[in-house]
């Protein structure tokens, strides 16, 4: 779609730093959205306004404008280069659908096009974007055109640690319910604070899911927020087990350790999941489940059995601070190098 001279002028204006006392000009040119001026980052191709501080890419901004039936912005974003077909995933009135057609949209989207739009829209990991994705795709009949297995593959890939090592999603037959958990998990994985609070306030029945995701994705900040402030609790040994699911989860493992979780059991769990860095971290904290770990492995796993067979390990001599303050934990473990891992790596095995 060829842009008009007026839309090009607006695009240039949106890229300028307009003083507050001249914001009335932006209102006159319809460069106003969610109680604030629209700005356009020409380098990143991001649309921003008061309610979308992190920004949305042009296609995603179009999806939002279509969902809100904001005709002026639909036309503007389309002229600025947004793909008008993206608007078809969020269209909710015939008038808006007609407008999209006038601007060049197809009659309908096929399965591959819908799936590609879904993949594209969820790419940017910001609070604004994840909340919008949830609002657009929740109970959206357009997803009925997409093969259920293909959709689940897209979702499961980013949640593979939880899928492979827990049964938390095994009985989630509803795609809408699965998508809700997916968006919530992504918010926690990338520590999107506004999105986390949005889901927490709106879906209190998923409190345990929030705690689980914080543990699995090593988000010690949200773990502390959920556990201490919001009083979302579960058995401490189960918390440690979930923290051990994914390797390098030192922060959430340490949080559970300070709360009183059994460090020998954590070592066993790490061994069973073949998470070597987690295992060495447990040794640093005083775990000594070498014999039990070897037995738990069964056949195979030669490397880890060799590690466990050596009598060269001992607890770290420099103790970590006994605190559940996430700032302290994050600072202490940001560049952590396991003492026992270094002992093994420098040990002469000949």
Curated annotation (Swiss-Prot):
Which parts are the ANK repeats? 57-89
* UniProt-listed InterPro entries: ASFV_MGF360
Q: Does the keyword Transmembrane helix apply?
A: no
Q: Which domain of life is it from?
A: Viruses
Disulfide links within the chain: none
- Offer one Pfam family short name for this entry: ASFV_360
**A biological process term (GO) from this entry:** taxis
- Keyword tags: ANK repeat
The UniProt similarity line reads: Belongs to the asfivirus MGF 360 family.
What does the UniProt function comment say about this protein?
Plays a role in virus cell tropism, and may be required for efficient virus replication in macrophages.
User: What is the name listed in the Swiss-Prot or TrEMBL entry for this protein?
Assistant: Protein MGF 360-12L
User: Could you tell me which species this protein originates from?
Assistant: African swine fever virus (isolate Warthog/Namibia/Wart80/1980)
């Amino acid at each position: 779609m060829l842009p008009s001279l007026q839309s090009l002028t607006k695009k240039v204006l949106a890229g300028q730093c307009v003083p507050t006392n001249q914001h009335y000009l932006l209102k006159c040119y319809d460069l106003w959205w969610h109680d604030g001026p629209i700005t356009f980052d020409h380098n990143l191709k991001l649309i921003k306004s008061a309610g979308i501080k992190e920004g949305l890419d042009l296609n995603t901004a179009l999806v939002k404008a279509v969902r809100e039936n904001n005709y002026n912005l639909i036309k503007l974003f389309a002229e600025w280069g947004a793909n008008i077909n993206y608007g078809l995933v969020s269209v909710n009135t015939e008038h808006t659908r007609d407008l999209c057609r006038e601007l060049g949209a197809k009659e309908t989207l096929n399965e591959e096009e819908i799936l590609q739009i879904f993949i594209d829209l969820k790419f940017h990991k910001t609070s604004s974007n994840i909340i919008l994705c949830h609002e657009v795709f929740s109970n959206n009949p357009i997803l009925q055109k997409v093969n259920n297995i293909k959709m689940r593959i897209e979702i499961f890939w980013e949640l593979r640690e939880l899928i492979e090592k827990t049964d938390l999603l095994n009985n989630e037959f509803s795609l809408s319910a699965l998508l809700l958990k997916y968006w919530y998990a992504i918010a926690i994985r990338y520590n999107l604070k506004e999105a986390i609070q949005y889901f927490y306030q709106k879906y209190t029945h998923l409190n345990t899911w929030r705690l689980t995701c914080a543990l699995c994705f090593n988000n010690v900040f949200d773990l502390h927020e959920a556990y201490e402030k919001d009083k979302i609790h579960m058995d401490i040994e189960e918390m440690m087990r979930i923290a051990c699911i994914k390797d390098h989860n030192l922060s959430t493992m340490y949080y559970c350790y300070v709360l009183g979780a059994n460090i020998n059991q954590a070592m066993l769990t790490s061994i069973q999941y073949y998470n070597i860095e987690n295992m060495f971290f447990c040794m640093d904290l005083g775990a000594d489940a070498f014999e039990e770990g070897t037995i738990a492995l069964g056949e195979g796993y030669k490397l880890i059995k060799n590690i466990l067979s050596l009598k060269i390990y001992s607890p770290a001599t420099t103790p970590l601070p006994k605190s559940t303050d996430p700032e302290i934990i994050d600072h202490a473990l940001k560049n952590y190098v396991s003492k026992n891992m270094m002992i093994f790596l420098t040990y002469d095995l000949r």
